[in-house]
């Protein structure tokens, strides 16, 4: 969503015919990106205390829920939408350091560098393909309506929800 946040907030401004907003979309996204640094570090500290899998699952479900709803909110008060963008930015970053630490911990001795290289490659590939997918949904659905943005960001939420589902499946498989 961070890749689409300026465009979405600009759509909100146009949709509501706002002539002046208290905080520009670019400033909101800058705050979101800065908050992401802190949420990643704090998220890993929480994961150390309360469990990595638990933190990652909660962060992924929270992120998926917020982004899944966000696109349908274009008629809501601008500052409320901006606040939801910040919340999403925090939740989407909360599990970042924990996922990387988990990848290192799960790697076999002698393969940590390779594991991190693959972890990074898959992460950047998803970071490239995800926004393309959102763009396709926007294009196919018309792109200039609340429904279009709702469906586009909902598609992102659905994909994000696959993370905690995959964690649950892996956990059940390892128990069984």
Q: What are these regions, as identified by a protein language model?
A:
Residues 7, 98-106:
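Intracellular helix-loop hinge segments at the cytoplasmic ends of transmembrane helices
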Residues 106-142:
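A late C-terminal transmembrane helix in Major Facilitator Superfamily
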Residues 1-37, 130-131:
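Extracytoplasmic gate region of multi-pass secondary transporters
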Residues 143, 149-176:
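Multi-pass alpha-helical transporter architecture, strongest
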Residues 39-52, 138:
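Helix-to-loop junctions at the C-terminal end of transmembrane segments
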């Amino acid at each position: 969503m961070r890749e689409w946040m300026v465009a979405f907030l600009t759509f909100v401004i146009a949709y509501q015919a706002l002539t002046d907003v208290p905080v520009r979309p670019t400033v909101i996204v800058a705050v979101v990106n800065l908050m992401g640094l802190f949420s990643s570090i704090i998220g890993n500290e929480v994961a150390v205390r309360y469990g990595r899998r638990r933190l990652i699952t909660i962060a992924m479900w929270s992120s998926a829920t917020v982004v899944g709803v966000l696109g349908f909110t274009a008629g809501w008060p601008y500052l409320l939408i901006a606040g939801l963008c910040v919340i999403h930015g925090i939740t989407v970053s909360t599990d970042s350091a924990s996922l990387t630490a988990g990848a290192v911990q799960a790697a076999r001795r002698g393969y940590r560098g390779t594991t991190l290289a693959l972890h990074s490659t898959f992460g950047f590939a998803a970071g490239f393909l995800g926004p393309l997918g959102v763009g396709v949904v926007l294009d196919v659905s018309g792109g200039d309506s609340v429904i279009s943005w709702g469906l586009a960001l909902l598609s992102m939420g659905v994909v994000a929800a696959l993370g905690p589902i995959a964690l649950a499946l892996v956990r059940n498989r390892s128990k069984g």
